[in-house]
Amino acid sequence: MIQWFLKYRPRSLKDVENQDGAKKELQEWIESWLNGKPNAKAVLLHGPPGVGKTTLAEALAHDYNLELLEMNASDSRKLQDIKSVAEKASVYGSIFGTRGKLILLDEVDGINVREDTGAIQGILELIEKTKYPIIMTANDPWNPALRELRNKTKMVGLNKLGKYPLRRLLKKICQAEKIICDDEALNYIIDTSEGDARYAINMLQGIGEGYGKVTLDLVEAMARRKERELDPFETLRDIFWARYAWQAKNAATSAQIDYDMLIRWISENIPIQYDNIEDVWRAFDALSRASIFLKRAKGGDWDLLSYAYDLMSSGVAAAEIEKKKPNWKPKWKKYQFPSYIQLLSKSKDIRDTRDEIIKKLAIHSSFNKTLNDTYPFFLIFYKKYDKRLSLNTKEKEYLNSASKS
């Protein structure tokens, strides 16, 4: 099922509310390009999350019959990724019969200048050589890393969506989706969204689809939930109970634990949640694919991390075929800690004793080098050195046991 903020996104500039100044600036800029005398090669659209930066760029392309060549700059981390956009724009003709192309680089403030070496420089080169107009978006345009980009672009700021336009939009969605929403609940959503239309629509959809109606109690409960990270048990429940991909993905990305530990939690509890053996197989298949993407991401191709999250959340949630039935209801199950964590907890005292021995050995070497190179041989002839190392009774007992195993 498509997310409502995408389903009800304005297609044309005339449908974009509360952004008259930005629309006028963009229209003048794109017309200067179409007339062959661009007043700026690139525009930096900036404003808070959910105000419609990407929507405005897409509406501009629609109204002027331009093919939109879109890339998320914070996901495309390599210089080559940025350069490939220029190559595609320059070499390949449009297959849609449009007048030209519009390049959109989303979330340029999400680029990590330390990890994403060359990305900013790649964008600057793209701006310098481009044959087509470029729009970039950013929540925080004053990030020091974007200083050179600011100097090379036309800055266009967007306003937060006002309460009245947001109310009209939410009421329109409720009517179209046949959702009953109390006025108090609607006011609460509008107030807490603070002009973020995407947040407001997602909250409306999350409650409306789950309960069939939107009340103040439900909205307040969901708002409190969004203000904090989910503990592992809540994360599992939201993933396993999700009927839509975006619900499972939101749960995974809001978890208190990192992706490595989340995979362990999900793996441990798949057989608990799913009764059908085929559902279990499909869930583990998705999780194994997530592990593959995660390993490749750690190898430096961090673009693949998003696929890992999709598979470990949406892929696992979609494993239960019964969810497709209209009368499906989630089953409450008692989840458990990963056995891996339990084993680590039980062995902590043993590992602490071992580490104390290694610290005594590692006088002229690092801990890890001593652990890997010296410690295995030390177990063979440790009795000759126990007095010199001042080993206590507990450490001697550990060595006696370890040397026999």
From Swiss-Prot:
Record keywords: ATP-binding, DNA replication, Nucleotide-binding
GO molecular function: ATP binding; ATP hydrolysis activity; DNA clamp loader activity
GO biological process terms held by the UniProt record: DNA replication
Lineage: superkingdom: Archaea
List of residues binding ATP: G47, P48, P49, G50, V51, G52, K53, T54
Family under the similarity heading: Belongs to the activator 1 small subunits family. RfcL subfamily.
Chain's role: Part of the RFC clamp loader complex which loads the PCNA sliding clamp onto DNA.
NCBIfam families: PRK04195.1-1, PRK04195.1-5
Assembly with partners or alone: Heteromultimer composed of small subunits (RfcS) and large subunits (RfcL).
Name this protein carries in UniProt: Replication factor C large subunit
Species, as recorded: Saccharolobus islandicus (strain M.16.4 / Kamchatka #3)
